[in-house]
UniProtKB/Swiss-Prot annotation:
Predominantly expressed in testis, in germ cells, and at a moderate level in spleen, liver and lung (at protein level). Very high levels in spermatogonia, spermatocytes and round spermatids, but not in testicular sperm and mature sperm (at protein level). Expressed in ovary. Expressed in the retina, including in photoreceptor outer segments (at protein level). Expressed in undifferentiated embryonic stem cells. Residues 174-216 form a coiled coil. There is a cross-link at residues 14, 204 (Glycyl lysine isopeptide (Lys-Gly) (interchain with G-Cter in SUMO2)). Residues 179-193, 200-213, 297-314 have a biased composition (Basic and acidic residues). Zn(2+) 2 binds at residues 33, 36, 48, 51. GO terms for biological process: erythrocyte development; innate immune response; negative regulation of innate immune response; negative regulation of transcription by RNA polymerase II; positive regulation of phagocytosis; positive regulation of transcription by RNA polymerase I; rRNA processing. The N-terminal zinc-finger domains are required for the appropriate production of 28S rRNA and the formation of pre-60S particles. Residues 140-152 have a biased composition (Low complexity). It is found in: Nucleus, Nucleolus; Cytoplasm; Cell projection, Cilium, Photoreceptor outer segment. This is Cell growth-regulating nucleolar protein. Residues 140-318 are annotated as: Disordered.
């Protein structure tokens, strides 16, 4: 769209609105284009259909404007309109309309859009006139197509002979480059995403294989350790039974000697003595082990004076009174803070009972009840004292 400025009043006007502005502004004799700055006197502005773009205006000396396909088609369409104006068989009313149409640079090339544009821009609402104008355009376009078709028919026989050419490496390279250039941004993005997914899968497989390799030696080590332990147990079992076997062998030899009788009786008696000695040894070792067990149990037993305080807890019960007394006796002056006493008693409870069902709130309630209701314990503010 071309814009002009009035040299008389300085108002900017579209090309379509120039005639209206001239009727309002009496001193308007010259119009200048906003983009290129050229001056147009009288009706010369009508020839100024298209002006330079902003890129051409501000691009500099080395700027080369890109040719758009739509512009080329529009110029061909306007050229066709100018040719139709010169034809003699066109009615004067239609010729005037064609002259008005040629002044525009945005003429549609399809029937429905063209007729709608005529109604809005040129204010032509009669359907008969619109049909006449479009019929002239359609006849001109069909005649051009008929003129262009014969050369294509003549060129067909030559095209029927197929020429087989061996594609060279250069042509293959150029075709590949062209196909890559033709790819859209979306296709390139999809290819990148696919490549990333493949790389991630490969990395996962490699990590999985490395983990499997690392796990196999660990399993072997575990199996070896288990084998060593089993071998040690078998060796320990094998070292124990030979005494029994020897004893059984001694008994068998005695029975054989009794059956056979004769000079082997002295030897049999000696064997029985050795077997008896070997039988007595395990008993001695058992007695020693029992003695050691008693020694281990002795430190845990309470003294006679403390026997009443530390009552042996029955199965499934915890001796709250005894543990509280024991903790208070260990404290200086048989006095300790409630917080420390609670911490020690509950820790002892968990160590003895291994009970995970009762909550901490229930344990605290039991602890507070035992302290407050027992007359042997005296609670003063935050401290507990054992009364003698």
């Amino acid at each position: 769209m071309v814009f002009f400025t009035c040299n008389a009043c300085g108002e900017s006007v579209k090309k379509i609105q120039v005639e209206k502005h001239v009727s309002n502004c009496r001193n308007c004799e010259c119009l200048s284009c906003i983009d290129c700055g050229k001056d147009f006197w009288g009706d010369d502005y009508k020839s100024h259909v298209k002006c330079i773009s902003e890129g051409q205006k501000y691009g500099g000396k080395g700027y080369e404007a890109k040719t758009h396909k739509g512009d080329a088609k529009q110029q061909a369409w306007i050229q066709k309109i100018n040719e139709l104006i010169k034809k003699p068989n066109v009615s004067p009313k239609v010729r005037e309309l064609l002259q008005q149409i040629s002044a525009f640079d945005n003429v549609p090339r399809k029937k429905a859009k063209f007729q709608n544009w005529m109604k809005n821009s040129l204010k032509v609402h009669s359907d008969s006139v619109l049909e006449q104008v479009w019929d002239i355009f359609s006849e001109a376009s069909s005649s051009e197509q008929d003129q262009q078709q014969p050369p294509s028919h003549t060129a067909k026989p030559h095209a029927e002979m197929p020429i087989t050419k061996v594609p060279s490496a250069k042509t293959n390279g150029t075709t590949e480059e062209q196909t890559e250039a033709k790819k859209n941004k979306r296709e390139r993005k999809e290819e990148r995403q696919k490549n990333r997914k493949k790389e991630k899968k490969e990395l996962k497989l490699e990590n999985h294989q490395e983990n499997l390799r690392g796990q196999k030696p660990k399993k072997r080590k575990k199996n070896q350790e288990a084998g060593h332990e089993a071998a040690g147990e078998e060796a320990a079992e094998a070292s124990g039974p030979p005494e029994k076997k020897k004893a059984q062998g001694g008994q068998a030899s005695e029975e054989g000697a009794d059956r056979n009788g004769g000079p082997g009786e002295d030897a049999a008696e000696g064997q029985t003595k050795t077997a008896a000695g070997k039988r007595k040894r395990p008993k001695h070792s058992g007695a020693e082990s029992g003695y050691k067990k008693k020694k281990m149990k002795l430190p845990e037993q309470p003294e006679e004076g403390e026997a009443k305080d530390h009552e042996a807890p029955s199965k499934g019960k915890f001796n709250w009174k005894g543990t509280i007394k024991a903790v208070l006796k260990q404290a200086p002056d048989n006095e300790i803070s409630v917080k420390k006493l609670k911490k020690k008693v509950i820790a002892q409870y968990h160590a003895v009972m291994n009970d995970h069902h009762t909550s901490e709130e229930e344990l605290l309630a039991i602890f507070n009840r035992k302290i407050s209701r027992n007359p042997t314990f005296k609670v003063l503010k935050d401290r507990v004292k054992l009364l003698k």
